[in-house]
A protein has these predicted regions:
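Glycosyltransferase catalytic domains, chiefly GT-A lineage
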Residues: 1-145
Length: 145
């Protein structure tokens, strides 16, 4: 969990309600975007990465036939079973994407899922907000930069 949220509920209860044997990773869906092209544009507008990196990743995904509408995670809340092989492999592949291509995690995570045919569980925003409260810290940071 990053600094976008404050904990307001019982985390033991939260985990008991979401964890299943079927899934090893849990994320929120991105609240505003579900296409990689939209995320590329946003990263470019906010200058969160260099144009060179953005174009390089775009071209790579295009060559691999990565579908534009493959969903996007909202990386502020990640719940994972750390000793699950599927989770470990996914995280290692994701790290390699970030290390070698773009440091923007939301550009690469859904690509890794697609590339390896892996599944995650998307958590309902309404459900999560029983346990976490957004604090808009990222919005405040952007205003003052």
């Amino acid at each position: 969990m990053d600094c976008s949220f404050n904990i307001i509920g019982n985390l033991d209860d939260f985990l008991l309600r979401i964890l299943t044997p079927k899934h090893s990773m849990y994320f929120l869906e991105h609240p505003k975007r579900n296409k990689i092209s939209q995320e590329f544009k946003r990263v470019e507008i906010l200058k969160k990465d260099t144009i060179n990196n953005i174009e390089r990743v775009k071209e790579r995904y295009k060559k691999k036939n990565f579908p534009d509408k493959s969903g996007l995670i909202y990386g502020c809340l990640i719940i994972r079973k750390h000793n699950d092989k599927n989770c470990i492999d996914t995280m290692e592949e994701w790290f390699d994407e970030i290390k070698y291509y773009s440091h923007r995690d939301q550009l690469s995570f859904n690509y890794v899922l697609w590339k390896f045919g892996r599944k995650i569980k998307y958590l309902s925003k309404q459900f999560c907000f029983q346990y976490f409260k957004g604090n808009n810290i990222h919005r405040k940071i952007l205003i003052f930069q």
